[in-house]
């Protein structure tokens, strides 16, 4: 996990992100106000998915999905995505030559699959098109809409790094063992700076590198990030990148 985080939350990415953050902050904050998802979380997903817009993929989406449609393992899924991509073209949101992305059919600056585009993409700038390739207002609002619909709890943290008491039962560090941060505090879970833990009604202790590595207390919004990409290392990277874009610490 640390090799992944070293790349995902590298000093270079943080520096680039802080520069780009100042450019898009008003748009991110508008999306945050509308959907209740923190602006820094939106910026962090943008950073993770396309390195703040510098790498959105260059493969024509229709071609990528048509090719995958002949892959026996994912053929049915790819055909569903291909039909969704054709509906996007039919709607006039994007021209075919601009519909580019990854080899797996993910598109735009925050890498939406076509079915997710149809369900969650937003025309935030009011130009009549949902443009997640070129309009940062649309990119950030669409990402916020996805997270809000996935269950993001407004006003609640994704989680934080914590210290565990020496006698903490690491067997309780399990995604299925959930309770309030207050109850975790009673078991010896402490914030890194000694302040009170944030209110997390349904939190779990997460040890991404095992009992000897850093510990995190993660809440419902961490699980929402897994709806965007179902890898705990990804969700942790988004949370840590958001924290550092806001001037906070990395892993201590």
What are these regions (language model features)?
Residues 125, 129-182:
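Ligand-binding pocket segment of bilobal, Venus flytrap-like solute-binding proteins
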């Amino acid at each position: 996990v640390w090799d992944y985080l070293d790349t995902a939350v590298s000093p270079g990415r943080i520096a680039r992100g802080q520069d780009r953050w100042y450019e898009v902050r008003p748009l991110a904050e508008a999306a945050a106000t509308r959907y209740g998802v923190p602006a820094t979380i939106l910026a962090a997903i943008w950073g993770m998915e396309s390195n703040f817009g510098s790498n959105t993929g260059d493969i024509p989406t229709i071609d990528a999905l048509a090719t995958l449609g002949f892959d026996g393992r994912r053929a049915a899924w790819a055909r569903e995505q291909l039909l969704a991509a054709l509906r996007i073209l039919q709607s006039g949101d994007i021209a075919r030559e601009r519909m580019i992305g990854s080899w797996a059919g993910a598109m735009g600056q925050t890498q939406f699959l076509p079915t997710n585009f149809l369900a969650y993409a937003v025309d935030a700038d009011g130009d009549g098109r949902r443009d997640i390739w070129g309009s940062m207002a649309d990119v950030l609002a669409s990402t916020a809409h996805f997270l809000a619909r996935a269950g993001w709890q407004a006003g609640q943290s994704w989680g934080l790094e914590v210290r565990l008491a020496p006698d903490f039962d690491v067997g309780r560090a399990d995604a299925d063992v959930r309770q309030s941060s207050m109850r975790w505090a009673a078991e010896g879970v402490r914030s890194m700076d000694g302040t009170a833990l944030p209110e997390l009604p349904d939190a779990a202790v997460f040890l991404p590198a095992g009992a000897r590595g850093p510990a995190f207390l993660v809440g419902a919004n961490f699980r929402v990030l897994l709806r965007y990409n179902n890898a705990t290392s990804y969700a942790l990277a988004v949370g840590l990148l958001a924290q550092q874009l806001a001037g906070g610490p990395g892993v201590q």
